């Protein structure tokens, strides 16, 4: 008997037919003699609808109250799925995140898991029940409901798999696995049989929406192999693991874009020690994640510093910097996007960057900023060119 954790996203449970489809997948897994824990997201566009409802009341809702509101979406999903499973003769019980034992820090709307108390889940499994858990949510030390941020249900599933030492952790989506690019927008994409944690982490953080990057971080930390599958088409998916069989096979595993990007530029920064610390220390105090950083050559004792962050955090970043006595000349560009290629094979092969830049040049796409690591190359470009850039780069590297 194996212990299997299965996670289903919002599109997989968006209506009655999809819920019963998921229930049959879960019931078949359980009837095969396995213990099953299911983690479910809110149905369809429920989270966006709840955010819109809050906007009808106030333009500045408190983070605590937003968590109280958003957590209701998953509670609807888990109860309906548990009902469907019981209707199929498969004994099931639904648990909220806090009933399942998720304890978090106090960072409302983007909380991090501090611990998972598994006694309740284990006790229900011992009673031969399928345990249906609300993803994305937990409880902090103040006994307040918290949410884990977008994609938090993936993180919930991996945390359960790690804590229970599950034999498998399956992430069901509306696509059949991890592809070299978004198959809905790019032609001739390839589905990957395997991908490493590091490669998947880069793709997830760069905008590939198959897996949440925090879930991949957690899977890598606890070596939880993930299997990305379609809830609509029962075909083999993609396995995410530490080491893949084709480590020296495909040079590039994927091309991704991220349109949630803002470029903030600070002009005339004193060219002296400690200024970068002051800038990024202020941003760190507000939990603003910075990605690419570009510093100009100093002149007349001054320099310019540009960096990228999520567009949703740009307003706070601008306010924090302008409120400082040191930085008054600050501007923001929200018309940018980031396109990236990822692959462990780049570590030992030359010429990959030139092909990427050639593809952009051939399509008259200007590069504003460049960032590289051992397995990633990213370029900041105009947002209007993002889709064209991904297709051009994919054609250059995979055709």
Task: Label every PLM stretch briefly.
Residues 1-216, 308, 381-382:
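Nucleotide/pyrophosphate-binding catalytic subdomain
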Residues 34, 90, 224, 288, ...:
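Short phosphate-binding/catalytic loops that engage adenosine nucleotides
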Residues 236-399:
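A conserved regulatory-domain signal marking ACT and ACT-like small-molecule sensing domains
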Residues 224-235, 259:
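Active-site C-terminal subdomain of aminotransferase-like
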Residues 219:
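Acidic-aromatic/histidine active-site loop/patch
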Residues 168-172, 226-228, 291:
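Short hydrophobic alpha-helical runs that function as membrane-insertion/retention elements
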Residues 211, 222, 233-238, 314:
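Surface-exposed amphipathic alpha-helical tracts and adjacent flexible/coil segments at the periphery
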């Amino acid at each position: 008997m194996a212990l299997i954790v299965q996670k289903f996203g919002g599109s997989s449970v968006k209506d009655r037919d999809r819920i019963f489809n998921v229930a049959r997948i879960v019931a078949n897994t359980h009837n095969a003699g396995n213990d099953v824990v299911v983690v479910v997201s809110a149905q369809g566009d429920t989270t966006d609808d709840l955010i819109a409802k809050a906007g009808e009341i106030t333009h500045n809702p408190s983070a605590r109250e937003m968590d109280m509101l958003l957590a209701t979406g998953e509670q609807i999903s888990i109860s309906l799925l548990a009902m469907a499973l019981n209707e199929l003769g498969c004994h099931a019980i639904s648990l909220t995140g806090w009933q399942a034992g998720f304890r978090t820090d106090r960072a409302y709307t983007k909380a991090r898991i501090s611990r998972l108390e598994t006694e309740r889940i284990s006790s229900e499994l011992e009673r031969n029940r399928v345990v249906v858990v609300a993803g994305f949510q937990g409880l902090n030390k103040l006994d307040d409901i918290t949410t884990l941020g977008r994609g938090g249900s993936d993180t919930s599933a991996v945390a359960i798999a790690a804590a229970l030492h599950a034999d498998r952790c399956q992430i069901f989506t509306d696509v059949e696995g991890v592809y070299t690019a978004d198959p809905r927008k790019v032609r001739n994409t390839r589905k990957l049989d395997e991908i490493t944690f590091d490669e998947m982490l880069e793709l997830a953080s760069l905008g590939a929406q198959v897996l949440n990057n925090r879930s991949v971080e957690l899977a890598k930390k606890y070596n939880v192999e993930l299997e990305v599958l379609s809830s609509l088409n029962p075909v083999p998916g993609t396995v995410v693991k530490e080491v893949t069989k084709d480590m020296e096979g495909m040079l590039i595993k994927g091309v991704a874009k991220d349109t949630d990007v803002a470029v903030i530029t600070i002009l005339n920064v004193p060219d002296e020690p400690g200024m970068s610390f002051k800038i990024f220390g202020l941003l760190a105090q507000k939990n603003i994640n910075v990605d690419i950083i570009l510093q100009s050559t100093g002149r007349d004792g001054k320099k310019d510093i540009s960096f990228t962050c999520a567009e949703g955090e740009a307003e706070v970043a601008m306010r924090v910097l302008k409120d400082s006595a040191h930085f008054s000349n600050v501007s923001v560009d929200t018309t940018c996007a980031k396109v990236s290629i990822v692959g462990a094979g780049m570590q030992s092969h030359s010429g990959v960057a030139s092909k990427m830049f050639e593809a952009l040049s051939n399509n008259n796409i200007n590069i504003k900023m460049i960032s590289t690591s051992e397995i990633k190359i990213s370029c900041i470009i105009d947002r209007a060119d993002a889709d064209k850039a991904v297709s051009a780069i994919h054609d250059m590297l995979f055709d």
